[in-house]
Amino acid sequence: MWTLINASPDVTAQIRGCEDLQPEAGELRGTPISEILLTNADLDHVLGLFCLREGRKLQVHAPQTVRDTLDAGLNLTPMMNAFCGIAWHEPPAVNFGPIEREDGRRSALEYRALKLPGKPPLFATKERTDGTHSVAYQIVDRDTGGRLLVAPDVAACTETLMQAMRESDAVIFDGTFWSEDELLRLKPGSRTATQMGHVTMADTSLSILRSLQARHKVYTHINNTNPVLSPASPERALVEAAGIVIGRDGLEFVV
C-alpha cells in the first residue's frame, strides 16, 4: 500500500504513469493508495481528491484548520460523502505517530506534521489567522530508520523545520521561486514570493539545502517562471552544484 502526499489536479495521469499504483488484476475501481496527507488547502494540492471519488472511502490526513477551510470553501466532506465517502485523520504534531490503515493494520511508516507559517488559500470564505494552515510532514520508516521530510510550501524556515531537515535522510523542499520579484518582473502588480507564502531559492533555501547532509535533496512545487527549469540556465547550474535535484515526474529514490 502507498501513502500519497497531496492530490494534485493531474493525479490520475500520475497514477497511470506509475506501475506500482495500478489496481490489482480484476479489482473493480481498486487502488493501492491507502491514505492521502495534505500539507495545506491550496487547490493545487486538493483538486485531485475529486478525481479519486469513484473508489473506496478516502482516508485523508490534515490539520483541523485545513479540513475546516476545505469544507467551508469547497463543501468537500458532504460532496465526497455523496460518492465514496471521506474519513479525516488529525496528524500528530509533536511526536511521531503510526499511519494506521483503513483495515486497522499499521503501516511501517510513522509521521508527524510540523506547523509552518501560512495563510488560508485564496478561495477561503473567511480569513482565519488562527490554527494551522500549512504543514510539512516528516516520515520515518520503522524498518530502516530512514527519514523523509516533505515541505512543498514554506513561508519561513522555523527552527523546528530546520532541525527536522538536519535529521532527515531525504528532503523534498519548496522550489516555487528563484527570486523575490520573479513574477513582478514579468507582470507588474503581481505579488512577491513572500506575499505568496514562499521562501526563494536565491535568498534562503539554496544555502540551507547545500549545508544539509541528507543523501537526497529535491526541489518540488516549481513555478513555470523559475529559471531552474531550464537545464542550460546558470541558476540550474548553481542548484546542481549544491547537490540538489530538480523534481520531475517518475523520480524515485530509496530512503
Task: List each language-model region with its residue ranges.
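Beta-strand-turn-beta hairpins that frame and shape the catalytic cleft
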Residues: 1, 96-112, 141-148, 255
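Active-site neighborhood of phospho(di)ester-bond hydrolases with catalytic His/Asp-centered motifs
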Residues: 4-8, 32-44, 63, 149-154, ...
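Structured loop/turn residues at beta-strand edges in well-structured enzyme cores
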Residues: 31, 84, 107-109, 166, ...
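Conserved beta-strand hairpin/beta-sheet module of binuclear metal-dependent hydrolase folds
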Residues: 1-24, 130-151, 170
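Pre-active-site segment of Zn-dependent metallo-hydrolases
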Residues: 1-41, 47-56, 157-164
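Metallo-beta-lactamase
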Residues: 63-135, 244-250
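Cap/insert and terminal regions of metallo-dependent hydrolase folds
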Residues: 132-134, 142-147, 155-251
